[in-house]
Amino acid sequence: DKDGMLRVIRKHRDAVSTIDATLVSEELLSAASAAWDEAVELSARFGVRNSQASVLAPTGTIGLMMDCDTTGVEPDLGLVKVKKLVGGGTMAIVNQTVPRALTTLGYTKKQVDDIIAYIDVEKSILGAPHLKKEHINVFACSMGDNSIHYLGHVRMMGAVQPFISGAISKTVNMPETATVED
């Protein structure tokens, strides 16, 4: 169904114009716009081989193997994760983007080092020295003592859905106290 697929590709392209330009770098927004313009042009000229232009697959373990802290729309499981190894034993995996995020937020090298040392010992950022209260949610993860509210997962899926022609496969973590109504 060539016409139907072209409508889908155009819909993805048109969704770029709905992105809040204050939340994304001009370079990234321009690249996204150009990529979808090219997708429309090439799809119209050559057709589309697959029935979907884009999907989001569950890639948590694969992401770890690729040395990524997180991939897709999945938040990090925790700032420090302990992975059971197939041959026995465990391996601690620390989120490598925390120092960069702290630096971007304006923390000094000494403050970053102190916060990272705290995370290494406590396995949490809550209570870390120098950490400003308004920055705590920046480091929220899918599980643990600073977890993202389940509606945050839903909102993230809603934000990317206009660019996904297939499915989003994602875990939405909810607390044990969640009810059917939740």
Regions found by a protein language model. Name each.
Residues 1-34, 40-182:
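Catalytic alpha/beta core of large soluble enzyme barrels
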